[in-house]
Amino acid sequence: MKKQNRLLSLILSLFLLLFTLVPQSALTVKAEGNSEMAVHFIDVGQGNAILVQSGGQNLLYDGGDQSHADLIISYLQEQNVKNIDYMIASHYDEDHIGGLVPCIDNFSVSNIFGPDYVHTSNLFNNFMNTATANAIIVQYPSVGETFDFGTGSFTVLAPNGISQNSNDNSLVIKLENGSNSFIFTGDAEETSEQDMISTGMNLDCDVLSV
């Protein structure tokens, strides 16, 4: 989403007191409450990579580009990740799935979610073939579907249809844990924003990742 985002008014800086800098150029946000959830924003340059840990489970949202694959794998290993319960490709641009392909080979992956469209790149084909080689079926969740995760859950907010614009195909999720909530947008742009508004779902959140 664009920085002048009108969809959500709450901004990340309101929660700077929750942030703890950790090695490997990552930022960790710990959700408050009785049940802890740690959200690691991993610095992969232009792309996106977010690790969420809760209740012994792990969720990886995007993996940056291919040049950051070793960093992603190393960081996950440092966090004692052995199984990725949910791997989510927001969309299939290189700077979002490049680091996911080797993660499929290096970790036990239970579920892979992505938007239901075909990208023309060789990397997309490699991503799909690697999933198939590891006996994983890529799933395409619908808007409004909710999945239990750790001590919380996440709900799919977008895409509500497929666009010619790859960014607007981003699989957007809202992650909730107790009174804390996060929205991960991939590269969703204005068309996707308007679609999310039209659904009438609750789009308030504590932390918005854009």
For the regions a language model picked out, list residue spans one by one.
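Non-globular, low-confidence helical/coil segments that flank catalytic cores
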Residues: 2-7, 17-210
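Acidic, serine/threonine-rich, charge-biased low-complexity segments
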Residues: 11-14
